[in-house]
From Swiss-Prot:
Compositionally skewed regions (Basic residues) per UniProt: 859-876, 920-929
Assigned keywords, A-Z: Coiled coil, Nucleus
Protein family membership: Belongs to the CRWN family.
Top-rank lineage group of the source organism: Eukaryota
Protein name, per record: Nuclear matrix constituent protein 1
Lineage start: Eukaryota, Viridiplantae, Streptophyta, Embryophyta, Tracheophyta
GO CC term, one of those recorded: nuclear lamina
Organism: Daucus carota subsp. sativus (Carrot)
Cellular compartments annotated: Nucleus matrix; Nucleus lamina
An individual GO BP term: nucleus organization
Coiled coil: 140-226, 328-488
Amino acid sequence: MGRVEDMGLNAKLMKLETELFDYQYNMGLLLIEKKEWTSKFEELQQVYTETKDALKQEQEAHLIAISDAEKREENLTKALGVEKQCVLDLEKALRDMRSDYAEIKFTSDSKLAEASALITKVEEKSLEVESKLHSADAKLAELSRKGSDIERKSHELEARESALRRERLALNAEREALTDNISRQREDLREWERKLQEDEERLAEVRRLLNQREERANENDRLYQQKQSELDGEQKKIEIIMVSLKNKEDDISSRIAKLNIKEKEADAVKHSLEVKEKDLTEFEQKLNAREQSEIQKLLDEHKAILEVKKQSFEMEMDKRKNDFENDLQNRAVEVEKKEVEVKHLEAKLAKREHALDQKHEKLKEKEQYLASKLQDLNEREKSMKLEENKIEDERNQLLSDKQEMLCLKAEIEKDRASTEEQRLKLSEEIERLKITEEERLELARLQSELKQEIENCRHQRELLLKEEDELKQEKMRFEKEWEDLDERRTALMKDLKDITVQKENFEKLKHSEEDRLNNKKLDTESYVQKELDALRLTKDSFAATMEHEKAVLAERTSSEKKQMLNDFELWKRELETKLFNEREDMENALRLREKQFDEEREKELNNINYIKEVISKEREDIKLERSRIAKEKQEILMHQKHLDEQHVVMQKDIGQLVSLSEKLKDQREQFFKERECFIRFVESQKSCKNCGEMTSEFVVSDLQSLAELENLKALSVPQLAENYLRQDLQGTPDKNLSTVTPGAVGLGSPASGGTKSWLQKCTSKIFIFSASKKNNSPDQNTSRRLHVEASPNKLLNTEVIPELPSGVAGETLEMQNMQVSNSNREMESNLNLSGTEQSNIDSKALDVEDSQQSDVRAGNRKPGKRAKGRVRRKRSAKEVAEEAKTVLADPIELNENEHSNGLASAYTNESRGDSSLVGKRTRNSRKRNPSQPSQSAAGDVGADSEGHSDSVTAGGRQKRRRKVVPAVQAPTGRYNLRRHKTAAPLVANGALSDPNKGKEKEIDDGGGIGEEIPDEVDGNTHLVQVTTLKKRINVVNEFSSAGFHGINATSESQDRDAANQLVSDTMLSEEVNGTPEQSRGYQNQGDTSGAEGEDEDGDEVEHPGEVSMRKKVWKFLTT
């Protein structure tokens, strides 16, 4: 029996071990599967995180792109505002222009009303189209809310947005080009209007000539034909402009069609996104439904299984409990009866107890082994805790068995008297109990499996909950991104609206330009009609041939009008057809959009399976974009390097400018040195006997003013030089900058005609700031610049010829008196400085002859007068003739008291005001031919400048005349004895003045110059001096030929040219009464002193011949 029990226990133990090994094997398989699932889960998590990072980067890039787009939109809006302001300014200017032509517009009001009605119709149609577009946009907005899968399509959207931006930039560039073309066309039209105004002026002149002279009818006809040809050309130009405008409209319509196509593509993409969004939502709902249904199924199945097992287990346990209780009761009765039998079995029980103890120890060892394994399993996974609980249950069961065995031991000790039959029964009962224990173990195992399944279900439930949370988070993110995309979409819609507004503005501008062109056409037609009417009125006196030609011209103009009207109507019809076609195109485009939307919906339903491939492609696109961004960064770096190089080049240019400024400072210092040398030279002249008085007076009157100039801080030489250079750099006109190179005797060749030295510019600028010239305008100062040589000796030897102001026929008598009184002194000083070997006795012997010649000169001498800053005005021939008549009608009145004493103080006050050294010379600036520097250089001998002009005596002999410069002019009064003609420029040494160089001027230091009268024949000006005293001129000529050695070479050729022309006093009167046309043109060329006498219209006017004769006789007697 003991062996059987041992064998049963061993079998049970083997079974338990096999079950444990199976359990461990199953747990290992579960752990391996768990590891595989965890590895897969980690991989999926990594992929998910990577996709999240990529999406974040793409979103950031997209936000940056949107911000850039917004900035560009702001800049575009600002540019549009500026353009609108420009358009408003242009419209204001157009309104001002149209106000001038208000009378002409009354005839075209009906046509304009029709055009406005058409425009209103077109605007109503456009409003209808816009309403339809708004409804379509609303539908699109409703559909756009359902878009999905934007993360996958963001790259495509960005690419398309960049393409749209490029196209917008291209459109802006084209719009700017169109505006430039329109502005150019406007400028052309303005030029055309200017030409029309000039034609009107010409017509007015022609009418006046027709009223005066009927002999010029043929010329008027020719002018009319020319104007007709010009009008034909203008009409052709207008037609060309209309053709170009039509071409531009075609280009704009093609571009609008392209934009519509691109909008359709964008709408198709939006539809596809919306379809994908719908599919995703449906897929999510399906997943949620599946998850819930599967979870519910699993739970229901598990619950049903558990309930069935629980019911069966409870039934079995209840049955066994009842059986066991009955058995125990029977056993207790039987144990009491069989105590005797139990005593016999004590030994056997002791042996069995010993065996059980050994088995218990083995079980303990196995329990320890299992505990170690359970600890390892607990460390690896929490699921092993369930197994430990099972083992603990088994332990509890074993302990309960032990307790039962102890109870049995007690019972056996009490029932030693039990019999062997009872022992057999007990053994049978023990076997039954073993069977129940096995069943209990099986139940425990089943319970553990159920617990494991429950835990697995819980784990799966947790995973599903986590997945649901993740899906919810993804859904939230997706919604956020969708909102961002909605915002972007709204921004794009705003852009499209802005583009439509710009289109409308452009169309409005186009219509306005068309209206303006039509108005201009009507204005030109009406202008032509007016001109034709005026010509008809003027040609009523002509023959029937002129009337026939007028009829022909009227028929031509009427045919042209009809053609213009027909063209205008055709153009209107074309515009209406274009608008109708555009509306049909828009409707067709909407239909196509709807069809494309349906097609793309079907396509996107099929494309859901290929989302993974799209993700991989998008990753590749991201890589390509990153490489592109890196390339762009490299390009930006290269551009920065290029900018740095340009910055270095600019720094080099700045260094060069600094070096130039230093050179200018050095030149300033050189100028100071030269000025000091000049002052030393003037001081050295004081020691001369003959010219000592002149130099002393010069020092007292002029050098003191120079010292005052030096003391002035505001008028320092460097500042004046810098200001002068700034004025030159700021772009003074070429006419004012043109200079004349004076010649110097024996002092080298003069400077080139078109250049100026820095010293010359500075000296001219300094000499302008005299006290008497503060009231002059800056235009006079710039037009009267000095050309001074680099050394003081050259400056002294420079010959300067004054330019008489235009419009002034005579000068004051007081000035002429003082010139006569100082002529002897000038002759003596110049003869001493010229280096001739005449003695003082010869000079005394020739004193009378010098005075006679000075008298002859004084009659015609015109000292230069400062030109006032007046605005020149062009005068017609009638005005000139009327002024000449008034001048001749006025009596010539001379005040003898003013000749003697009265006006001396007035002139001294004015002469004292001229404080600079060369300020006196700038007063009498003249025009000069720069082609004669060598001739003038041969005639300069003394310290001061001298000049020679041809004088013709009554007998026809050629005489040389010498210009003498006084050292100091005595104060005299000032009159404005004005001749209404232009005075010819006086040129030294007999050089002929060039009428084409009317802006070149030189400086005279106030010396007396004989009056010279322009006799313009074939465009050349010959200088003729009217003289009446033959003996005096002969004596002076002999004296001048004996006294001057260096002037013969240059004066002979000039005397030959001047000797051929003899002019009498009557020519002077003729020139005063009627000015030739050439002199009138020369007057209009621009003499700054032409309007000097406008403030002094009340002064007396003298006849030049009469004044010269009386003055000559009186001066001869006084000297």
